[in-house]
């Protein structure tokens, strides 16, 4: 019996957990976005 891979891609889960709205919904998430803006990231979130 082989063990399954841990990464099972799903766009819905990706957006719900790491999307812009998810980041904006918490204070810490907004800190993440602020850091990424300061760094000059082209993409702020998933």
Curated annotation (Swiss-Prot):
Residues 1-46 are annotated as: Disordered. Signal peptide: none annotated. Keywords: Ribonucleoprotein, Ribosomal protein. Residues 1-11 have a biased composition (Polar residues). GO terms for biological process: translation. GO terms for molecular function: structural constituent of ribosome. GO terms for cellular component: ribonucleoprotein complex; ribosome. PANTHER family: LARGE RIBOSOMAL SUBUNIT PROTEIN BL34M, MITOCHONDRIAL RIBOSOMAL PROTEIN 34 FAMILY MEMBER. This is Large ribosomal subunit protein bL34. It comes from Xylella fastidiosa (strain Temecula1 / ATCC 700964).
């Amino acid at each position: 019996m082989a063990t399954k891979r841990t990464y099972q891609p799903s766009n819905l889960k990706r957006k719900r957990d790491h999307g812009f709205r998810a980041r904006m919904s918490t204070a810490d998430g907004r800190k993440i976005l602020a850091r990424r803006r300061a760094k000059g990231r082209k993409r702020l979130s998933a």
